[in-house]
Amino acid sequence: MNLINIFPDPSKLIDIENTNKIVLFIFLKITDISIKKNIKNDFFKENINILHWFDCQYTNIGKEDFWSDALIIEFKNKNNLQEIYKSEIGRINVEAIQVFNIFPKNLPRLFVNFLKLFRPIGFFFEMIKSTKKELQNLKNSDSNILPTKIQAERLLNEKSTKKAYMINLLELKEMAQYKDKSISITGREAYVEKYGKQAFKSVILLGGDFAFNGRIIGDSLIEHNAPLDTQGKWQAIGIAEYTKPRKMLELEKIPGYSKGLIHRDAGLKRNYNLYATKNT
């Protein structure tokens, strides 16, 4: 393992995006549990604001199970990050690390809570429809946006009773690619506007929520021993919360979701999806 400062040099940040609070998303690979405990204790002593800390379980979309932890940390401003960067607090032994600078884009809670009022409808469709349909079109072959059948079956058979958090890294196509060549819209319009809104509603109706949504600013600030699955440039991160892991594969039970998949496929270039639980 290597002693690495997991906090980036503030000079690497894009100034126009970081006039106030700075939010970092950090992937870590740590196999020594004692190191993880020490990090958490040190961060607590220094009043570092950890918005979320996730224990990574396994990869749903991607080639390998790799990361052990995922953190979202907020700093008051660039000066606050500068102080922490210069201190020894961030220098830890890690096998791998990847850090992104993100701009939060969370939806208003008032709107989310309004959608939750319609959950009984979602529970009804969940009861009357089978999950088997969701596996029919999955294959054990390479895909940048779908799990393999083996990965999906692992998720369906997951016995954990903890809430499941699905961490998504997203890269969109510049222009959406439909079979109907007369459709000319951007990848963002296809994925976010046409697919994303329906997916969001479906997650909420199935009893879920969204722990975090944000736009990734620039390239990775730190990338050491990162796997091919997460290397490179990403545009957004979304973390969906489900009452149980298998719920991610039951979204098609909600009316309207299946019709939106054509827009997901047209607009999404690459997706990394990781199943995680909350570190408490």
Specify the residue positions occupied by each region the protein language model found.
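Residue-level marker of structural boundaries
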Residues: 90, 256-257, 269
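Short S/T/G/P-rich N-terminal loop/turn motif that feeds into the first structured element of a domain
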Residues: 1-235, 247, 277-280
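Charge-dense polyanion-binding interfaces
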Residues: 262-280
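Accessory, usually C-terminal, subdomains that scaffold auxiliary metal cofactors
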Residues: 243-250, 254-263
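Active-site scaffold segments
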Residues: 236-241
